[in-house]
């Protein structure tokens, strides 16, 4: 193609330019002879360097990390590297030597200096055909003028390049038979308007000769011909690198989407955790406030009673003293008419009475008592303001689980790491203010949200609007006991509570005097675990009005001795049966007085073996001893706190908290053991279809949560009473294994299994702790031949309970269109 000086470095060439003209000519021919080998050697070295780095020239993709920088090991090129590398890509032709030239004004060439075609370019000094070009002067010269140009002190170190061989011409100057088409503008340098002849390995772009001497002077480059050696391997490597890069980028995008969902879920859990945690502080303060106010009220009443008693005694003494004074006055007035003995008797009696009245006056003397309020330690306010915090769990300790959209951390694992890192209750170690740092951790969250899809309501379901219009009675503060986050005993299987824990995440510290764990049968010494049995073991309670007979019963429960308690609704009484089905005793009658009922419904027994009965049409709840003696009642008709409109079912937990389904008020209410209102959860018609129009059955789970059956919307709700929030929703109308049709009574065993009376589907459903179907009991004789043939095909299940040995006992009710007394042999209580 072209020729540039020789294989020597620029300083050597500049030194040689000072030699005589003859020597210069000889040296020029010698240089040309040896230059070809040097050029070939340089081209070979450049190609080897380029090919050796083919694989290293593409980005290094890491599928787990992303795009990693490719750090090269080559050192910067030498100062004269661009000359040697430049010569490697040149073809030589013709001779030229460097000699002294003079300086003087010369005319411009006939073509523009930017043109790369020298077929008609003339020397700007002597009008001879130009063969070289001075880059600094931007002038074309012939070989003779170059010598004069070199001899000038001002231009002795200028950069000289030879002009390219004309397109279509042979290197020797002859015409080419197959003339090539001139390159288009796309192959011309945008800066110097020169043909692109080299590939800059550093910049990954094509450059011209001028670029190699200026903009890319310190870079490593090679000719296009050398670069094209191994082009197939380069293309394959580039394609492979692009494919790997595509997979890496897509994987990173999937990770980002997964992390976005994780952040939304995590922040929601953080908010719930913060509300639940600080709610305990609020509850503790409210409890203390109510305790002190209650103490002041009792103190006021006691002091007023004492003062009123003192006033009554003093008034009595005053009246007696007045009578004595009148008697003595009469004696004084009639002394002349009275015997001495009579006078002495009157006088001594008067003196004795006056001494008694004086003693009363002395004993009943009012005393002034002034109490003062000892204010709390206000320095605790700052400590309370600094409680809690949010820390970042260290990624090094963060367990990783796989996801369909990438690799994402498990939130439950994050909680375990956060809890282990923090190791404190109610706060964060080393946290000061709202955001703290503990052992290099910057922010924290600690709530469990497993990925069970059953743990939350469907996104298409609008959750009921909850009102927190409640207050709590004074009660001592007690930290949770047991090894779990819910304060459960360490022996209880945490896997048995997955459905609740999926929605619950974790439970706060308790604010009542008992742990949150609740037994299936209060006070039972053994673990009650429901067992799968299709064999009918016992049936009793025929229809009628005699002892041991029932009329449209609804409520059912079992005590720790295995006695079966039934709310005999139409007979307005409660009957207690022995485990063998024989009647033990009964109590109650129709009326509105204490111990009287008007259609009793739900029934349960607490840890003290007290019997709690919902007096439905009297709109109240009554509590009796284990022998049926009336203790107390609470509730009346209305919509206010503590009032009911047709309450239906009742349940009690280990803290003796009583929960009642208030069907017509579309809510549930919670009370303490004495019937004092604690809280309510109101459902404002925002359920799957028309809201909880009629909450029916209710029970406590082993962790103290509440499950409510929605009679009209055919579903179950899992509720955390401490935060007044619905955690999970399950079911819809249908006859499948995960569907309900008028669900009614329900209960739980000690491992969290849920037993539901699916009323209109005429069956009993048993679910595990995740609400996955386990088995069912059909009550229609046509489907279940083990059922007594005396049952009608329209009979429904209404309530269910568990015997201490794990057998299921359920209650049958007549369908609304059935006629009473149609079958005297029909039994309403069945044990499987």
UniProtKB/Swiss-Prot annotation:
Segments annotated as NHL repeats: 537-580, 584-627, 631-674, 680-722, 727-770
Gene3D superfamilies the record matches: 4.10.830.40, Classic Zinc Finger (3.30.160.60), TolB, C-terminal domain (2.120.10.30)
Residues found modified as Phosphoserine: 107, 470, 475, 506
Residue ranges covered by zinc fingers (B box-type): 118-163, 184-224
Example GO molecular function: protein-macromolecule adaptor activity
Residues bound to Zn(2+) 1: 123, 126, 145, 149
Domain of life: Eukaryota
Assembly mode: Interacts with the head domain of rhea and the kinase domain of Ilk. Interacts with AGO1. Interacts with mei-P26.
Protein name stated in the entry: Protein wech
